[in-house]
Amino acid sequence: MTKSDLKNGTAAYVGPLDKSATKVTIPATVKIDGVTFKVTSIEKNAFKNNKKVKTVTIGKNVSKIGAKAFYGCSKLKTLKIKTTKLTAKKIGSKAFSKTPKSMKVTIPKKKFKTYKSMLIKRGVNKKAKFKKS
């Protein structure tokens, strides 16, 4: 589910429509009423305390992840990040806190070191398995 900004041609992911979904892909773009929008952000609390989701893929246009976006996602086993547009200031506080220690995180090769450090600072456990895509 998204909210959109017609003027900028962007959309924000606010959370899954199907609260029981175990696999979620946040797309690079969405089409609303025939208009294509780039999905550039994941809103704060988008998946907060979601106990069902196991796999999340973040699309290539996402440049912002809100505070506590994935907080308390206790079943999240796989996180695939396709975007190279994230910065430390654009990942909100505790965005990944209280996620499993055994989570597998796939990061774009050219951003591996930077993203790994940023994600740990925002709550991904140091024991998570990080790999390059």
PLM regions with names:
Residues 43-46, 66-69, 93-95:
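Consensus positions within tandem repeat domains that build extended binding/scaffold surfaces
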Residues 11, 23-24, 45:
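Short, surface-exposed, low-complexity cationic segments
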Residues 19-41, 51-64, 74-89, 100-114, ...:
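Structural signature of tandem-repeat unit edges
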Residues 1, 13, 125-133:
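Intrinsically disordered, low-complexity repeat and linker tracts
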Residues 92-95, 113-127:
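Short, aromatic/basic amphipathic alpha-helical patches
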Residues 1-17:
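Short beta-strand/loop segment at the start of cytosolic alpha/beta domains
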